[in-house]
A protein has these predicted regions:
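Short beta-alpha connecting loops at secondary-structure transitions
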Residues: 258-266, 503-510, 520-531
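Glycine-rich phosphate/diphosphate-binding loops that line cofactor/substrate pockets in enzymes
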Residues: 135-152, 207-216, 306, 327-341, ...
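Extended redox/cofactor-interaction regions of prokaryotic respiratory oxidoreductases
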Residues: 2, 166-237, 242-249, 272-276, ...
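Flexible glycine/proline-enriched surface loops and loop-helix/loop-strand junctions
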Residues: 120, 217-220, 259-260, 310-314, ...
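Acidic/polar loop patches that form or flank catalytic/metal-binding clefts of enzymes
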Residues: 180, 289-290, 326-327, 340-342, ...
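N-terminal export/assembly segments and adjacent metallocofactor-ligating motifs
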Residues: 2-287, 299, 313-314, 322, ...
Length: 764
């Protein structure tokens, strides 16, 4: 059902954001507070007189952090979204992206009805069809693929908050082990595998840093304040305000580097050398926590011998830092231990040797005695709730994701019903990683180790996500069938055979959000309004496909409410009870070593922190990290660095009207001396060409002293070629187009993408 377009200008957006912040600064909170408190304070509410205000609970989907939100709607229209004060992540606050959620929902460019392709792949020519036609056609194509090649010939890519239904539930019921999420091999897998090798525990989606009591933090290439995860931004701001020491290692003076006590403008690709020198200082000057390591770690003697040559003087020549800077920062960390941490970071797939770099970071944290200590790193704990009572899936644990559940990682490789393992090379191309989404492209082209003939892309802009775009396009041309499920007509949608338009988070129920955390919790998502146009929720699509494919035994539930209540009954709750509890169920955690009463929480083979890794040694890898040099930029080229912007998420939000108004296109950060040499000034349009001849669209120069002379930087997600996106199409330049090369991490399967170089072209 169509709704009246919601008219919100930037001025009204900022005004309503301030009003929401004022309301949520109050100490009291109940199911009806946000509006009533604002009314009591005499603050204007432009929508207040339109009708009865309805309050519902959800989790935000404007970035992967999924903060709890309180949604206000009037007469079937969402008018305001605020952070849920009961939610451990949002704590009553939202970033600009979260506040702009209604603008995303009411984007007039949204997909409105199911479609089937009528033109050539990539032309974007479709006809609108009924849901019955689209689902019947999709089911028939999947049946044909399964009968001819087996269920494993269907790959499922999933991202955003609803990916559970396709990349987990459907993929496992159908029987394909080839489900993958970019949050793993294109983002976090090196940190997860390194943490598991070192501590026996992955990091988890929420980095377990005990910010409230932290006295010294180190950020290596982590752009807090630009990456703008709500909770982390709050935590950092509070820690910084109370005087915590901040060390930032980054080739660029990022926003957070500008707040640091020490900024180390390191040469890109040399971070591991710096961390090894820190270890050298901590051990050589006996600054480490001896009692902690004696009780909880193994391999100290091997580590000491290994790092003896890696002096600050050795690292200084490699990193372009001074030996004194390296010593002083190591001593600063030690001075504040154990309330001293190198924050793991999130996007860590950089150079292809990233698991070993992350291992070195975790070794420093162990030397500081930080893990399991107040003010250091706490133990994440998953909330308890039972799965929906379905029969055993045809395949289990196939999709990867941001991280495994802490303490629950399995050494077993998922297998399909035919006994075939994943086609991405897990346990053969790379040692430990659960998935490598980018490695599923090759079987689509070559059929090795077996053919992948169909792709389901849920919420993944395939062309703006996976490195080596020409290879991805080649794969999409060869596939027999592509299904795109999305809210917007992103670039890859033009390549689909069937397009299914999804309802947004304000229009649907979704799977429960279970969060491993210091205080583990469960959050709900319920619809605030009816879906716009002819859109449907993912759970409904999956169920309808399952019934058409003979998978009825997995879909005994008829509604999302029935499914969710069947899960919640295992903890004595229900959807109605969750509503009464402000949409969140909080459980008890065990964050510190003292909570384990002398028992080891470390799930390595030795039940201790393994500074020296026997598993890596046995597999033929360095058991203690070493520095591996990366390639230098060719003459006339710069290393291409990329990152985030506080009002945008990946390539998802560039078309959102309010956020587009705040930041419409990216810029090229170029060292001002280099700009002068090239005769360039701020605002000049240039083009970039990489080492393989791939060329970007035009991008404006930002000449600045805030970046090294050997690198350039741009925000990811721009330069989209999607005519259906009236605001984002053709704005800025795409970093993904320039990432034709990547290096596979042989341990985690992560794709190191910072090995690309670009030259600047002033005219084309």
């Amino acid at each position: 059902m169509a709704r009246t377009k919601l008219q919100i200008t930037r001025r009204r957006f900022l005004k309503s954001t301030l009003l929401g912040a004022a309301a949520l600064s109050l100490n009291s909170f109940s199911a009806r507070p946000l509006v009533s408190e604002l009314q009591r304070m005499g603050l204007p509410l432009p929508w207040y007189r339109r009708g009865q205000i309805k309050v519902t609970y959800s989790t935000c989907d404007m970035c992967p952090w999924r903060c709890g939100v309180v949604v206000q709607s009037v007469n079937g229209q969402v008018v305001k979204v605020d952070g849920n004060p009961a939610d451990p992540k949002s704590r009553g606050m939202l970033c600009a992206r979260g506040q702009a959620g209604p603008s995303f929902m009411y984007d007039p460019d949204r997909l409105r009805s199911p479609m089937i392709r009528t033109g050539e792949r990539g032309e974007g020519k479709f006809k609108e069809v009924t849901w019955e036609e689209a689902l019947d056609y999709t089911a028939e194509k999947l049946k044909q693929t399964g009968q001819a090649f087996g269920p494993e010939a269907v790959a499922v890519f999933g991202h955003t908050a609803g990916d559970f239904w396709f990349a987990d539930y459907f993929a496992q019921a159908w029987g394909t082990p080839n489900a993958a999420k970019p949050a793993s091999s294109l983002c976090t897998s090196p940190r997860e595998e390194a943490a598991t090798l070192t501590y026996g525990l992955p990091v988890g989606g929420h980095e377990p840093v005990d910010w409230d009591q932290l006295n010294c933090l180190v950020l290596i290439g982590s752009h807090i304040g630009e990456d703008s995860r709500n909770t982390v931004m709050q935590d950092f701001a509070n820690a910084w305000a109370r005087g915590a020491k901040v060390i930032v290692v980054d080739p660029r003076l990022s926003n957070v580097a500008a707040k640091a006590d020490t900024w180390l403008p390191i040469k890109p690709g040399t971070d591991t050398a710096l961390v090894l020198a820190w270890i050298n200082v901590l051990i050589g000057e006996e600054l480490y926590d001896k009692a902690y390591l004696a009780e909880w770690a193994t391999g100290l003697s091997e580590l000491a011998a290994h790092v003896a040559p890696f002096t600050p003087e050795w690292a200084a020549e490699i990193t372009d830092l001074t030996a004194d800077q390296i010593r002083q920062t190591a001593r600063m960390m030690a001075e504040h231990r154990p309330q001293s941490v190198i924050v793991p970071g999130r996007h860590v797939t950089w150079y292809g040797n990233d698991t070993q770099r992350m291992r070195a970071i975790y070794i420093v944290n162990a030397l500081l005695g930080a893990y399991g200590r107040e003010g250091g790193i706490y133990f994440n704990k998953s909330p308890y709730i039972e799965s929906y009572p379905h029969p055993p899936f045809a395949v289990t644990g196939s999709s990867g994701g941001c991280s495994a559940e802490p303490g629950q990682e399995s050494d077993e490789l998922p297998l399909g019903p035919s006994g075939k393992a994943r086609a991405d090379g897990a346990r053969s191309k790379f040692l430990r990683g659960a998935t490598a989404l980018q490695e599923l492209i090759e079987p689509m082209i070559t059929g090795d180790p077996y053919p992948i003939k169909a792709l389901i892309a849920y919420g993944v802009n395939v062309l703006n996500t996976i490195p080596n775009r020409p290879r991805t396009i080649e794969a999409m041309k060869k596939l027999d069938f592509i299904l795109a499920v999305d809210v917007l007509p992103q670039e890859h949608v033009a390549w689909a055979d069937v397009v299914l338009p999804e309802a947004t988070i304000y229009e649907r129920y979704d799977e429960l959000w279970t969060v491993a955390h210091k205080t583990p919790y469960i959050a709900m998502r319920e619809p605030a309004v009816e879906p716009l146009y002819d859109t449907k929720p993912a759970w409904w699509m999956v169920r309808e496909l399952g019934l058409r494919l003979g998978l009825e035994k997995y879909f005994k539930w008829e509604t999302a409410e029935e499914y969710l209540d069947a899960r919640l009954v295992s903890i004595g709750s229900s959807l109605e009870k969750m509503r009464q509890e402000n949409g969140v169920i909080i459980q008890n955690g065990k964050p510190y070593l003292a909570d384990f009463e002398g028992k080891s929480p470390f799930a390595t083979h030795s039940q201790k922190i393994e500074l020296y890794s026997p598993e890596l040694a046995e597999a033929g890898f360095d058991p203690i990290p070493v520095y591996e040099p990366t390639d230098e930029p060719p003459a006339g080229h710069y290393r291409l660095l990329y990152g985030r912007h506080p009002v945008h998420t990946f390539a998802k939000t560039q078309n959102t009207p309010l956020l587009h108004d705040l930041y419409a296109e990216n810029e090229l950060w170029l060292n001002e001396a280099e700009a002068t040499t090239q005769g360039l000034a701020n605002g000049d349009a240039v083009w970039l060409e990489n080492q393989d001849g791939a060329r970007s669209g035009p991008i404006k120069v930002k000449a600045t002293p805030r970046i090294r002379a050997d690198a350039v930087y741009m925000v990811h997600g721009f330069g989209q070629e999607a005519p259906g996106l009236s605001r984002a199409n053709g704005r800025g330049a795409s970093d993904t187009k320039l990432q034709t090369a990547y290096k596979l991490d042989p341990i985690s399967g992560g794709a190191g993408m910072r090995i690309n170089f670009v030259r600047i072209i002033k005219e084309v």
